[in-house]
């Protein structure tokens, strides 16, 4: 299983599937089509049934039931795209057998080193087979590891028909990294009662709480006049924008928050005297606090509009997704089964909130409750990303164990 996982993962990682937030197509990039078509062929090759790819690049397939029990249909999902923030072109994975616990030279020419001094969690991986970058790209373990693990688990079950299971659906989705993963996902066609995304981080992660999320876009209009004759005439939109930012609580930012704490995050600030644009994301686990954060932004905008003129400030707030806990709590047994599966395999479950979102955040509100399982990677979205092949094996084993438990608990 380990060698199969390594080979699958490296094959997927070499396809550039960065998503593009500025694209209006689905998938947003051609590389995702390339990977999707590859996955369709591989699903057929291992013996999966009902293998489909739709006009938006969503890949689905079925592992038919081999039991007479009335087992709920469960699904497993992973996303094909990688993050747009760091290049995913020409990914060249490096394989390190039996990691010795020391520095890993990713790129000798550029002096790029993956060191336990900077990333102390490396100490947990001594003796593991690691897959790293060559220091010039991201790796794409988020979430090509999840794809490889689902594929390998399905292949294992097909090769071991003595393991009884209900009907299982799998899906590989585009554009998760730009928040559009489920936008065109056909929940009815997928036909699962519950699902799991395999999109988490280190060994044991099990997540069913996500942020409530919104984005805010502020446009401020100024008045540009020659600075030599500007007294009483110029209105500098940059300074108004700075005033807006300064009225938000400075300590409620990503760099100062953790756990269940929410934040405001200024993503971009682009401006001139004449016009300035601010782009924020707003995050909070608590729905009331989430609404209060949005209200705070509206209050600041209204105050500045009163001070500088109503026509000078526009604020647009759009909700992006909500905390999936609200939809998963009524079917909490799906979390409990994942917890039991990990425990059965000697893995300590680490139940914690996702300081972010997954496809499951949106799917849960589309009628498909979907908690998140670990995929095994570390340091996602950058040159220091790596993954343990040993923990990829455990992720695939957890998928198999969850499927077995659903069958065993059915009548």
UniProtKB/Swiss-Prot annotation:
It comes from the Bacteria. Zn(2+) 2 binds at residues 142, 177, 381. One of its GO terms (cellular component) is cytosol. Its EC number is 3.4.11.4. GO terms for biological process: peptide catabolic process; proteolysis. The active site is at 81, 176 (proton acceptor). Its cofactor is Zn(2+). Its main location: cytoplasm. Keywords: Aminopeptidase, Cytoplasm, Hydrolase, Metal-binding, Metalloprotease, Protease, Zinc. It is found in: Cytoplasm. InterPro entries: ArgE/DapE_CS, Bact_exopeptidase_dim_dom, Peptidase_M20, Peptidase_M20_dimer, Peptidase_M20B. Signal peptide: none annotated. It is an enzyme of class 3 (hydrolase). One of its GO terms (molecular function) is zinc ion binding. Binds 2 Zn(2+) ions per subunit. Zn(2+) 1 binds at residues 79, 142, 199. It catalyses: Release of the N-terminal residue from a tripeptide. Transmembrane segments: none annotated. SUPFAM superfamilies: Bacterial exopeptidase dimerisation domain (SSF55031), Zn-dependent exopeptidases (SSF53187). Cleaves the N-terminal amino acid of tripeptides. Belongs to the peptidase M20B family. This is Peptidase T. The lineage of its organism: Bacteria, Bacillati, Bacillota, Bacilli, Bacillales.
């Amino acid at each position: 299983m380990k060698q199969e996982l390594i080979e699958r993962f490296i094959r997927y990682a070499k396809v550039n599937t960065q998503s593009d937030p500025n694209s209006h197509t689905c998938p947003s990039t051609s590389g995702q089509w390339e990977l999707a078509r590859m996955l369709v062929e591989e699903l057929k090759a291992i013996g999966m049934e009902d293998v489909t790819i739709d006009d938006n690049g969503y890949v689905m397939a079925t592992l038919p039931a081999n039991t007479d029990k009335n087992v709920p249909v469960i699904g497993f999902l992973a996303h094909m795209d990688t993050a747009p923030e760091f290049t995913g072109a020409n990914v060249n994975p490096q394989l390190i057998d039996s990691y010795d616990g020391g520095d890993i030279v990713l790129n000798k020419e550029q002096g790029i080193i993956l060191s336990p001094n900077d990333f102390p969690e490396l100490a947990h991986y001594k003796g593991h087979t690691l897959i790293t970058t060559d220091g010039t790209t991201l790796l794409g373990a988020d979430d090509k590891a999840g794809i490889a693990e689902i594929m390998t688990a399905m292949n294992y079950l097909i090769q071991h028909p003595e393991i009884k299971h209900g009907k299982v659906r799998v899906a590989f989705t585009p554009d998760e990294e730009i928040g559009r993963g489920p936008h065109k996902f056909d929940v009815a066609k997928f036909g699962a009662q519950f699902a799991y995304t395999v999109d988490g981080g280190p060994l044991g992660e099990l997540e069913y709480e996500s942020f409530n999320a919104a984005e805010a876009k502020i446009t401020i209009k100024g008045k540009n006049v020659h600075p030599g004759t500007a007294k009483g005439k110029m209105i500098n939109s940059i300074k108004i924008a700075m005033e807006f930012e300064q009225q938000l609580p400075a300590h409620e930012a990503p760099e100062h928050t953790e756990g269940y704490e929410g934040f405001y995050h200024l993503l971009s600030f682009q401006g001139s005297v004449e016009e300035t644009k601010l782009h924020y994301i707003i995050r909070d686990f608590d729905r009331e606090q989430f609404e209060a954060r949005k209200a705070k932004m509206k209050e600041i905008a209204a105050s500045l509009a009163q001070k500088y003129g109503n026509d000078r400030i526009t604020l647009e707030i759009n909700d992006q997704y909500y905390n999936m806990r609200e939809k998963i709590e009524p079917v909490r047994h799906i979390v409990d089964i994942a917890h039991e599966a990990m425990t059965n395999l000697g893995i300590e479950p680490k139940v914690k909130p996702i300081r972010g979102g997954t496809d499951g955040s949106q799917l849960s509100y589309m009628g498909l409750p979907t908690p998140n399982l670990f995929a095994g990677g570390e340091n996602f979205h950058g040159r220091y990303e790596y993954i343990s092949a040993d923990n990829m094996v455990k992720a695939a084993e957890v998928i198999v164990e969850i499927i077995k438990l659903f069958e065993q608990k059915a009548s």
